[in-house]
Swiss-Prot record:
Name this polypeptide is given: IQ domain-containing protein F3
Native source organism of the sequence: Homo sapiens (Human)
Domain IQ intervals: 89-118
Alphabetical list of Pfam families matching this protein: IQ
Molecular-function GO terms, alphabetical: calmodulin binding
PROSITE patterns: IQ
Cross-referenced SMART domains: IQ
Top-level lineage group: Eukaryota
Amino acid sequence: MGSKCCKGGPDEDAVERQRRQKLLLAQLHHRKRVKAAGQIQAWWRGVLVRRTLLVAALRAWMIQCWWRTLVQRRIRQRRQALLRVYVIQEQATVKLQSCIRMWQCRQCYRQMCNALCLFQVPESSLAFQTDGFLQVQYAIPSKQPEFHIEILSI
């Protein structure tokens, strides 16, 4: 029966320690690689998420631009329609005022013509004494009354 201390081979405890140390180093190296791989994967997922968010933001921006353009076009069309209605109303107002003013002028003209017809006496009914005290100078008015109409445009 031999004693263990008399053996001439390498120390088994030292070999066991070295083996455990190598195993711990391998596990540590493996953990570092797993951690690095996790960081790379997290970074890549972040890149993909940011890319997706950028695409979504650009699409939302395009939709907003389209919508603003559509709203502006509708506003412009409404303004043009209102302007057309305003112009038509103004033209109708001017025409109506013109017709009424012309009607008033015609009414005034007719009244003057009727008044002149009352004042005109036929020539055969005038018997003037040319000698003596009564001398009347009578000028026969023309068939049309003389008056001037001034039309002012605004």
